[in-house]
Amino acid sequence: MPREDAHFIYGYPKKGHGHSYTTAEEAAGIGILTVILGVLLLIGCWYCRRRNGYRALMDKSLHVGTQCALTRRCPQEGFDHRDSKVSLQEKNCEPVVPNAPPAYEKLSAEQSPPPYSP
C-alpha cells in the first residue's frame, strides 16, 4: 500500500502528479531575478545613452550639417529658420551626381518580362 506522502521525493513534489504549485522560495527567487534583470537593463540603457546616445544630435557643427542636408539650405547663405517652411515645389531638387539617370523610369512594353504560363 502506498504511503500518504508518496508524491514527495526528497522533500520536492513529483512533476505531473497532483497539483503543481510554486513554493515561497521559488517565488522569492523569481522575484529577485526579475529585479536584478530590470536593474541591469536600466543601467545598460543609461550607460548606452551616456556613451553615445543623442551626443551626435547635440553637437552644433553636426546639427548645422544635418540642417543643411534636410533643408538643402545652409545658415551661412543668409537664410534663417522661417525659410525652411518652403513648399516642396519651390525647392531645387537637382541630382547630387551629375549626368545621373532619373531615379524612376517607366518601363516600356518591350522591356517587361514575358507573361507567366504554367
UniProtKB/Swiss-Prot annotation:
Alphabetical keyword list: Endoplasmic reticulum, Golgi apparatus, Membrane, Phosphoprotein, Transmembrane, Transmembrane helix
PTM annotation (Phosphoserine): residues: S108
Family matches, as InterPro entries: MLANA (IPR029242)
Keyword set includes Transmembrane: yes
Record's comment on post-translational modification: Acylated.
Cytoplasmic side: 48-118
Membrane protein topology class: Single-pass type III membrane protein
Spans annotated as Disordered: 78-118
A Gene Ontology cellular-component term: trans-Golgi network
Expressed in which tissues: Expression is restricted to melanoma and melanocyte cell lines and retina.
Subunit description: Interacts with PMEL. Interacts with GPR143.
Protein function: Involved in melanosome biogenesis by ensuring the stability of GPR143. Plays a vital role in the expression, stability, trafficking, and processing of melanocyte protein PMEL, which is critical to the formation of stage II melanosomes.
Protein name per UniProt: Melanoma antigen recognized by T-cells 1
Organism: Homo sapiens
Top-level taxonomy: Eukaryota, Metazoa, Chordata, Craniata, Vertebrata
